[in-house]
């Protein structure tokens, strides 16, 4: 089998911690590592081709990718639902494009994180660009607000006041369509 030093170039199993060290300009080493429990420490990550940073939020209703999500202020427990109208406390968008997804419950070793959490939590985009469900004409740069249809957004009208808690983000693309579709929005964050 081919190897690079003590590490095989393919196959095999590592146990414990794999460390990468790099000498620093001022002496000493900068250490990066991956542990057997899944913890990783790196200075930079490249190649994440997806568009946003997301967190699992407690689910209060059925949602689908692109839905605008808000805190359910009628509940005494933390849960999140589809935003509607100028609803307070918009938190983000149900995403299926995340580069990073944090939170949720720790799955059993053999379980997939997504499958273990999707029934109980919503993957909500907190920062970055994500495709949002909208209706009506949208121009690049328009602020996106919840519409009167739960989970669906719309472009703010010229001169319309919207509290910061209601703003989803701004459109980074636009079109003249009026049907329901998904457009890319830079979520506030």
PLM features: residue spans?
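Fibrous stalk/shaft segments of extracellular and virion attachment machinery
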Residues: 1-35
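Extracellular receptor-binding modules and their adjoining Ser/Thr/Gly/Asp/Asn-rich linkers
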Residues: 35-189
């Amino acid at each position: 089998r081919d190897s690079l030093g003590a590490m095989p170039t393919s196959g095999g199993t590592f146990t414990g911690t794999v460390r990468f060290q790099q000498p620093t300009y001022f002496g000493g080493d900068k250490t990066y590592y991956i542990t057997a429990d899944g913890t990783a420490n790196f200075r930079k990550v490249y190649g994440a081709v997806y568009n946003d940073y997301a967190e699992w939020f407690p689910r209060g209703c059925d949602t689908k990718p692109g839905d605008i999500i808000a805190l359910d202020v009628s509940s005494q427990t933390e849960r999140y639902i589809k935003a509607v109208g100028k609803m307070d406390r918009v938190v983000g968008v149900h995403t299926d494009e995340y580069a990073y997804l944090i939170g949720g419950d720790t799955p059993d070793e053999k379980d997939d994180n997504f499958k273990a959490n999707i029934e109980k939590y919503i993957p909500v985009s907190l920062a970055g660009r994500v495709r949002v469900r909208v209706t009506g004409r949208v121009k690049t740069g328009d602020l996106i607000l919840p519409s009167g249809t739960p989970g669906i957004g719309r472009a703010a009208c010229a001169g319309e006041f919207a509290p910061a808690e209601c703003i989803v983000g701004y459109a980074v693309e636009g079109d003249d369509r009026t049907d329901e579709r998904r457009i890319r929005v830079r979520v506030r964050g």
